[in-house]
Amino acid sequence: MSISRLKRREEFLRVAAGRRKWAAPGLVLQVMRRADGAAPATPGDGPRVGFTVSRKVGGAVERNRVRRRLRSAVERVFEDHAQPGIDYVVIGRRQALGRNFPDLVADLEKAMRRLGAFGQSGSPAQAPEPAKDAAP
């Protein structure tokens, strides 16, 4: 399963508007199921992931290091457990710099389980529901 990237601001904002998030020591994970027509179809409608690390984390070198560590953790976990049709946003926290890599991977797995976005390899799991619009 190929994992596409979220790149546009509107994609990040749509996931954040879904209000499904879990904070762990090294990261914050936001998830949202893509509703029909909400995003252009991707090949195989696989999962998409976006990364963001704010300037509060540190300078460019530290932010890029956090982003690389998170990208590596996501590659390891998503290979077997990401669900198709779901957008994930991973927000890096300052603690991700000094956190052991196995702990960072465990943070991501725990956040995915808590949000109902952790699929077992080879078996479909129930995905989070799309956000309900406030307007009728």
Q: What residues fall within each predicted segment?
A:
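Positively charged, solvent-exposed patches that mediate nucleic-acid binding
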Residues: 1-136
